[in-house]
């Protein structure tokens, strides 16, 4: 089973994404900021990351840069945000995101991206 880490400071968003992913058979863990996420990854890297941009202590951009440079450079990551600005999307890709989705992310959209990026058959 694939392991997914949700990195978001909003508990309601983490619960929403967790419900979608667990119902599709993924193993899900959560972190409320980039620092906590990096600590979790040191124990065992994940197969996929869903990362918010605006978080305390270490934002999504900083987390993705650390992930790519030092931990697991090849693991797919989706950055999610309420911001639809092109400059935020460009910054997400520069930081190492494989995709940029606007919140709220639809269940089918999220599962399709995961399936595609993990090379799985349709969920």
Regions found by a protein language model. Give the residues of each.
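Charged docking surfaces used in two-component/phosphorelay signaling
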Residues: 15-23
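C-terminal output helix
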Residues: 105-114
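Receiver (REC) domain active-site loop signature in two-component systems and cognate sites
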Residues: 55
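Short hydrophobic/Thr-rich beta-strand motif most characteristic of the beta2 strand and flanking loop
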Residues: 25-32, 40
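Active-site beta3 strand of CheY-like receiver
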Residues: 44-50
């Amino acid at each position: 089973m694939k392991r997914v880490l949700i990195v978001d400071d909003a508990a309601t968003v983490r619960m929403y994404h967790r419900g979608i992913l667990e119902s599709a058979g993924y193993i899900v863990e959560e972190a409320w900021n980039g620092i906590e996420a990096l600590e979790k990854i040191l124990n065992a890297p994940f197969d996929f990351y869903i990362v918010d941009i605006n978080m305390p202590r270490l934002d999504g951009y900083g987390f993705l840069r650390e992930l790519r440079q030092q931990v697991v450079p090849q693991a797919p990551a989706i950055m999610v945000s309420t911001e639809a600005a092109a400059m935020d999307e460009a910054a997400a890709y520069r930081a190492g995101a494989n995709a940029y989705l606007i919140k709220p992310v639809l269940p089918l959209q999220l599962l399709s991206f995961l399936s595609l990026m993990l090379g799985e058959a349709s969920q």
